[in-house]
């Protein structure tokens, strides 16, 4: 994501040491280089995109952000600790000469734990963090110290840049205010206790930023609360204080480079570093409304040129691109994705903000993996260094020595974690468990300790608590995996480790992994050696690490034996398609934005829709900040909009630039641009020029094989743009080819087909207008029916392989041209499916030619239809509203799972092979095929457990532990015959989901609930194999049965059955908008008949 940080993270370690030695200045004066570090030594990703990986080669769903947050907390040291650097050894040598005499391991652990407790004094309350004042002035504390992180990898430690941690906050159990001196910590310690430094401006006054939207440009103050990973901002006002007799005439308070302030209100003006300091401008809050989101809500971030599509859409000058930040996040109150476009005042502020976000993300991932490290893994030198770096300051703010007299300083040093500390850790890590359960574990550890050697700690000021060894016991009990233990017991049969042959049997016979080309067992041996323990075999932890790794991904991939998968003609594929791609909300009053194109392309969409209209000649171009082009007219400039509705237009040129930029990042296969032309001939000329200028040689403007009468394959059109546009030439000179298709002769006549259009029906097939216009919402601005503009030849001729023609009849010669494409509304195709004769013709047509189906214009809220009936009849492009994550879109994304197909799915052979001619025209070939060739598929699914499930979506229950249960649904089958088991079916929620069963409710445990519920039976299906599995995680207000309370869906996963591998698998879940929940997963066992895979493998 943050590609621009790569070079900043490459600063050498010597420079890092110099920065750390000169770290006494204020955070606001820090050098930008001090704000960046890379915990792994590798450059960060190009996008902070919290979705599943789109690349098959890079897909590692659980390896990077593991729900098993305690995987690194071990009781025994299993690896040799890294050795300190020469400089560290020198520091240790000098410090050890003045250290105390106690060097035993037990006292060492206690003292380290004491230091950690003093460090961990951050609050979870953002208001509390701002209320802390210093002793001498009453102003917010701005003095914060630097923790120098020694970055470690798997092989050797590396020195990293200093990172800024938030100011010291009040501890919930003490009135004492602790000050920290500069220390050195290994990053595992700092991160495991949740510490990170950020510039103090984010926790004190807030960073001034310029917020850009379609409606306005406003100044805001931006805060970050690192204790709970929260971002917040408020609108700001400016006040000016004169500090000298000479007052600067400069009034611009905009980011550097902005000279045109006509688009900004007076409240948006503050000073910048470039302005003379004779007048001091300060920001104040204009209202009490606070906008906020947390780190986990962020879906993607675009910085600088990555966000050029948004910047151009908002008419912001390119000179401000270097300070541009776009944050896409989920707004819980509005239950939708929101875009936050920001411009920093200068380069330094930009680096501060980006660094803070990146470091918080790294910390969040680290906390989710580790929670707290095992100090036994620290080498002795690091232990001594920690002991001799005193964390506790005296009353005068100076360090008195290695040991501080608590009675003199009136500071109370704790060597334990209270139960309140445990709750704070749980809240920070989103451990969604009943408080009573945590209390029981807490008391259990205390009881075990009192029965052995140690007694519970108790002081007059603090309640009883756990020392470090006891806390490790607490974590061990909390993370205990009974489900994994049962699997291990069944495999090991009493053994402590498993050897190679046993692991090979597990991988091949239980996990059903296909290693047919691994004759020498080299692949399996590589996996075995990677997770071997010290006993030269696999233990229980080895097994879990393998199940969580990329070697155990739950989804199948195209194997090397399927190298010809993309070599078939385009008409033999299902193609991932979007309807009204430019919309981010409803059809009537939603926003139009390039964001719609960016998001769909990032998810693998291969056919996007662009509705092109004339720009309004009565208005001028929106003022571009930083330019002087205020008087340029927008007449005849093509715009993208949803007709004459309340949606906002966007520039066609900006749309094409954004499409080109993101077109082939996720998928290399051809992208179809479906153009809907509603503009004048003059504007169409500009459309042609824009397409050619921006797309260049990547756009298909001539057949790649002029003699071919079949469509080319995706492999032949790799990285190419295909234009789909209406054909203007009449079909009067068609030549029939040998295979029955028709092609046009070289001589063409130019005529134009005119159609009518209304605001409710703006797509290709206008036959829906009659039925749609009568049901138009009163919210739409009505206009006279005008004839659609004529499509000029220059534009029509760009439709090389996807010529849009109006459907009249399947038997006409124009319906047999190899490169035509029918576009039908859902009402039209539904009528065809109900007619037996038309259904046969529909199936026959779609075996050889292209068709696109789109939702009705009466779906004012951009809802979706069920795409399964249209796929079952071979429709290649079933366009859905991607901005609405309902069942239709869930099925659409499940079919085109990016990790596997990247937007192109080869249709089942039964939908590609030519149909046999029947002696009777009344025979329904599909009905006959379904009756004689149905399949019975045995299945056995076991939902074993869940991990870090989301919290209640309602504010009324947000602080309560959830009562989760999971529904299991089979979609697309003719029938399902369930085996008898303890789970009872519940009534279907929709007509497309007739077969649902549920697990039992687990009381107040969303952290690691064990469901242990099996679902087995037989699926009766046709040979098209369009069978899908849907998991929905619910949070219930009832403790026993769903019918007794409210049930809130909190996570969803829909996948095609034969995409799933068998065996034990971790499956990541999506939120209600289809975005992956990075830390939430379910652990399941999958079994079904191998016969179902034959169609998938042997296509």
UniProtKB/Swiss-Prot annotation:
The production of the second messenger molecules diacylglycerol (DAG) and inositol 1,4,5-trisphosphate (IP3) is mediated by activated phosphatidylinositol-specific phospholipase C enzymes. Its EC number is 3.1.4.11. Coiled coil: none annotated. It comes from Candida albicans. The gene is PLC1. Keywords: Hydrolase, Lipid degradation, Lipid metabolism, Transducer. This is 1-phosphatidylinositol 4,5-bisphosphate phosphodiesterase 1. PANTHER family: 1-PHOSPHATIDYLINOSITOL 4,5-BISPHOSPHATE PHOSPHODIESTERASE BETA-4, PHOSPHOINOSITIDE-SPECIFIC PHOSPHOLIPASE C FAMILY PROTEIN. The active site is at 579, 642. It catalyses: a 1,2-diacyl-sn-glycero-3-phospho-(1D-myo-inositol-4,5-bisphosphate) + H2O = 1D-myo-inositol 1,4,5-trisphosphate + a 1,2-diacyl-sn-glycerol + H(+). Residues 1-10 have a biased composition (Basic and acidic residues).
């Amino acid at each position: 994501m943050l590609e621009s940080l790569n070079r900043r993270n490459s600063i050498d370690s010597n420079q890092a040491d110099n920065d750390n030695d000169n770290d006494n200045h204020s955070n606001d004066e820090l050098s930008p280089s001090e704000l960046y570090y890379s915990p792994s030594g590798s450059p960060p990703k190009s996008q902070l995109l919290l979705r599943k990986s789109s690349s098959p080669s890079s897909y590692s769903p659980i390896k990077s952000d593991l729900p098993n947050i305690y995987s690194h907390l071990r009781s025994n040291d299993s690896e040799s600790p890294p050795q300190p650097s020469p400089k560290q050894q020198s520091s240790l040598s000098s410090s050890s000469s003045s250290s105390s005499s106690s060097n035993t391991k037990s006292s060492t652990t206690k003292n380290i734990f004491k230091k950690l407790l003093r460090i961990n004094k951050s609050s979870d309350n953002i208001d509390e963090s701002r209320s802390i004042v210093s002793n001498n002035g009453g102003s917010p504390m701005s003095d914060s110290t630097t923790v120098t992180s020694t970055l470690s990898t798997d092989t050797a430690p590396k020195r990293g840049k200093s990172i800024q941690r938030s100011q010291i906050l009040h501890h919930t159990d003490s009135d004492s205010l602790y000050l920290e001196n500069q220390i050195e910590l290994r990053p595992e310690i700092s991160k495991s206790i949740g510490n990170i430094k950020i510039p103090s401006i984010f926790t004190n006054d807030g960073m001034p930023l310029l917020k850009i939207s379609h409606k306005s440009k406003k100044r805001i103050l931006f805060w970050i609360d690192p204790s709970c990973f929260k971002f917040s901002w408020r609108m700001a006002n400016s006040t000016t204080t004169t500090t000298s007799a000479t007052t600067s005439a400069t009034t611009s308070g905009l980011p550097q480079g902005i000279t045109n302030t006509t688009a900004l209100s007076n409240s948006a003006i503050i000073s910048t570093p470039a302005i003379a300091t004779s007048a001091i401008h300060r920001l104040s809050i204009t209202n009490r409304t606070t906008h906020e989101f947390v780190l986990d809500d962020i879906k993607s971030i675009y910085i600088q040129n990555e966000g050029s599509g948004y910047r151009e859409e908002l008419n912001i000058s390119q000179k401000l691109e270097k300070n541009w930040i776009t944050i896409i996040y989920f707004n819980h109150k509005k239950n939708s994705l929101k875009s936050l476009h920001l411009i920093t005042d200068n380069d330094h502020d930009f680096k501060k903000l980006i660094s803070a976000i990146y470091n918080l993300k790294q910390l969040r991932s680290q906390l989710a993996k580790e929670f707290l490290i095992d100090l036994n893994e620290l080498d002795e030198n690091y232990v001594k260094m920690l002991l001799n770096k005193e964390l506790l300051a005296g009353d005068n703010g100076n360090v008195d020595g290695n040991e501080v007299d608590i009675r003199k300083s009136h500071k109370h040093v704790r060597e334990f974690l209270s139960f309140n500390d445990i709750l704070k850790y749980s809240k920070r890590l989103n451990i969604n468990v009943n408080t009573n359960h945590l209390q029981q574990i807490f008391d259990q550890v205390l009881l075990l300790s009192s029965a052995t050697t140690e007694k519970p700690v108790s002081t007059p000021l603090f309640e009883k608590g756990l020392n470090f060894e006891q806390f490790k016991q607490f974590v061990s009990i909390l993370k205990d995996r009974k489900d994994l233990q049962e699997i291990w017991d069944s495999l090991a049969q009493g053994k402590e480790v498993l050897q190679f042959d046993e692991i090979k049997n597990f991988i091949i016979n239980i996990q059903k992994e296909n290693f047919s080309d691994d004759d020498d067992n080299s692949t399996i041996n590589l996996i075995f050696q990677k997770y071997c323990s010290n006993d030269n075999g696999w233990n229980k932890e080895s097994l879990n690490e393998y199940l969580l790794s990329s070697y155990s991904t739950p989804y199948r991939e195209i194997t090397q034996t399927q190298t010809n998968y993309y070599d078939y003609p385009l008409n033999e594929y299902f193609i991932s398609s979007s309807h009204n791609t430019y919309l981010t909300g409803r059809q009537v009053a939603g926003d139009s934005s390039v964001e719609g194109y960016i998001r769909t392309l990032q998810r693998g969409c291969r056919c996007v829709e662009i509705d092109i209209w004339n720009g309004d000649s009565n208005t001028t171009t929106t003022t571009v900040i930083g330019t002087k082009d205020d008087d340029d007219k927008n007449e005849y400039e093509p715009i993208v909009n949803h007709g004459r509705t309340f949606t906002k237009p966007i520039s066609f040129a900006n749309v094409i630039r954004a499409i080109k930029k993101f077109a082939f990042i996720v998928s290399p296969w051809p992208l179809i641009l479906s153009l809907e032309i509603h503009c004048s001939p003059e504007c169409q000329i500009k459309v042609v020029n824009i397409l050619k200028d921006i797309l260049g040689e990547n756009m298909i403007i001539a057949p790649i094989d002029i003699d071919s009468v079949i469509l080319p394959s995706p492999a032949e059109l790799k990285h190419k743009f295909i234009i789909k546009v209406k054909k203007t030439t009449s079909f009067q000179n068609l030549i029939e080819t040998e295979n029955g298709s028709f092609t046009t002769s070289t001589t063409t006549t130019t005529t134009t087909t005119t159609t009518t259009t209304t605001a409710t029906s703006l797509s290709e097939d206008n036959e829906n207008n009659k039925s749609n216009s009568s049901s138009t919402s009163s919210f739409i601005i009505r206009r006279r029916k005008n004839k659609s503009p004529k499509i000029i030849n220059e534009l029509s001729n760009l439709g090389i392989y996807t010529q849009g023609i109006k459907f009249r009849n399947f038997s006409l010669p124009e319906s047999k041209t190899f490169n035509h494409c029918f576009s039908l509304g859902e009402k039209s195709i539904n009528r065809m499916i109900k007619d037996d004769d038309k259904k046969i013709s529909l199936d026959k047509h779609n075996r050889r030619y292209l068709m696109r189906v789109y939702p009705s214009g009466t779906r004012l809220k951009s809802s979706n239809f069920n795409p399964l009936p249209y796929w079952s009849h071979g429709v290649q492009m079933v366009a859905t509203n991607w901005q609405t994550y309902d069942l239709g879109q869930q099925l659409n994304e499940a079919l085109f799972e990016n990790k596997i197909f990247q937007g192109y799915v080869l249709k089942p052979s039964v939908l590609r092979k030519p149909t046999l001619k029947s002696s009777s025209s009344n025979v329904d070939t599909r009905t006959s095929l379904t009756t004689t060739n149905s399949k019975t598929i045995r299945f056995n699914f076991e939902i074993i457990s869940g991990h870090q499930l989301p919290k209640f979506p309602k504010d009324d229950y947000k602080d309560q532990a959830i009562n989760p249960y999971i529904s299991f649904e089979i979609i697309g089958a003719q029938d399902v015959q369930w085996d008898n088991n303890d789970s009872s079916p519940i009534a279907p929620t929709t007509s497309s989901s007739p077969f649902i069963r549920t697990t039992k409710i687990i009381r107040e445990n969303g952290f690691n609930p064990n469901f242990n519920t099996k679902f087995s039976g037989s699926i009766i299906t046709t040979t098209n194999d369009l069978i899908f599995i849907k998991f929905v995680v619910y949070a219930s207000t009832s403790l026993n049965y769903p019918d007794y309370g409210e049930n809130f869906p909190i996570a969803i996963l829909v996948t095609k059955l034969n995409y799933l591998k068998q065996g034990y698998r971790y499956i990541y879940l999506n939120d209600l908008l289809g975005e992956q929940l990075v830390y939430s997963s379910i652990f399941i066992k999958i079994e079904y008949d191998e016969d179902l895979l034959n169609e998938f493998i042997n296509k």
